[in-house]
Amino acid sequence: MNNPDDFTRFEHSGWERVAHKYNDVWATLTTQFIAPLLRAANVKNGMSVLDVACGPGYVAAAVQQLGALAVGIDFSREMILRAREFHPGIEFREGDAQALQSADETFDRVLMNFGLFHLSSPDKALAEARRVLRHGGTLGFTLWAKPEESPYSKLMNDAIEAHADMSVELPSGPPYYLFTDRTECRNALQSAGFAGDSMTFETFSVNWKVPTADFPFEAELHAGVRSAALLARQSPERLALIRSAVEKSVERYAVGEGYAIPIAAYIVVVSKK
């Protein structure tokens, strides 16, 4: 399937389905990248900041704590409902990252925490981010690092490559490990109208602390979207092999009564010309 609308519908229905699980499953991982993202983007008191693909609103909440004015948008109504529940003092709207409703030059900063690879047309989202930024404003976003730089991504990727049937039909979307090459990322940003020479591209690593060895597999299967769709289309036999391989790999990261799995992401910041 190569229709971008198919991928958008796939992602939208997926996040509507698992939004209620995000806080309990993924928050302890993805929120670890917010503070370094805000530092890299130099978010300051009094700024106007748009949190794109905001999910439950964690980035917007961190922005607000710095004294900046945050607005969050997400295409998932279920995510927006949770963001409003968790952070009642912040404005959250349903919206499309690839067709923002905001006027030109509205925000000082546009931020996106692990959202680009969930969009059918990341280039459109970059162009829209530039459009709504004020002159000299900054775009900051995070991307999962490629498996060879990120132990968690590698163990999951290795298990899937070894045991999954990759011929199952899934909607065609952007690469999961999007813009992992610095030159590719800079070129995409320049094509969207940003000042490519201003780009910073840093790797940041954290430990994802989980209670059991099967937690990561269960998270991907039941609280993911792209990974969940791939896993759901496997035979019971293949799924069992993937589960076993993931759990065996996680065991090496045992710490105390749980596990601490290293995982890396890229923090990318660029200025509007």
Listing of model-derived features with the role each one plays in the protein:
Residues 4-7, 18, 199-257:
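C-terminal helical/coil "lid" or tail adjacent to the Rossmann-like core of SAM-dependent
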